[in-house]
Amino acid sequence: MASADRSTLFINATVLDGSEDMEPQPDMAVTVERGVITWMGPSAVAQAPAGAEVIALAGAYLMPGLINMHVHLCGSGKPVSAGDAGALMKKLDNPVGRAIVRHILKGSAQQQLASGVTTVRGAGDPLFADIAVRNAIDAGKYQGPRLVAPGTGVTVPGGHGAGLFAQVANSPAEAAEQVRDLYARGADVIKLFVTGG
């Protein structure tokens, strides 16, 4: 991965540029300076900026980062029953449990990045762990994608995610209070669940 504070020239890449047709463009070069793409063209005419690292991709694909717009970093994708979720949260809502959840979310975020996903929009995670992981990534403690974190979601009684990655709001006033609390905790977006569990 190119460092954000130096220049990198990728050569001999097969570029997928993100355009509508996105036809593979073989034997291309891309210059990145301080994290910004500044030039793209045929490898034969590429000129490396002074001090740039040159990475020969031998025909490997190079493309813009992907964006995953719906992620529960805590989950494996397998269903969890509401009863199991409540029992699990009681076991995890302590310093050791919160550290375990943050570790799981960190691993999931890093797996997203390793898969080419450079931006993740969270869809609700337990114990505000996504906000903690986002803050650690932003502080440079470890690598990860740009994380747009909602904290926990807000759901209706008996709603999706209740007790695991969503707080139950029993009234509009309670929902408004939860939104204010999420904002105060650093949520980037608010995730609402309005369907049943």
Where are each of the predicted segments found?
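Amphipathic, non-transmembrane alpha-helical secondary structure
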Residues: 7, 105-106, 110, 131, ...
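Divalent metal-coordination and catalytic microenvironments
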Residues: 13, 30, 35, 59, ...
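Histidine-rich, glycine-flanked metal-binding segment
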Residues: 2-3, 15, 19-63
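Beta-strand-rich domain onsets/edges
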Residues: 3-5, 120
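Metal-associated gating/positioning segment near the N- to mid-region
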Residues: 61-136
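Extreme N-terminal starter segment of soluble prokaryotic enzymes
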Residues: 5-11
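Hydrophobic/aromatic beta-strand patches that form the interior of the parallel beta-sheet core
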Residues: 10, 53-55, 148
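Metal-coordinating catalytic core of metallo-dependent amide/deamination hydrolases
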Residues: 138-197
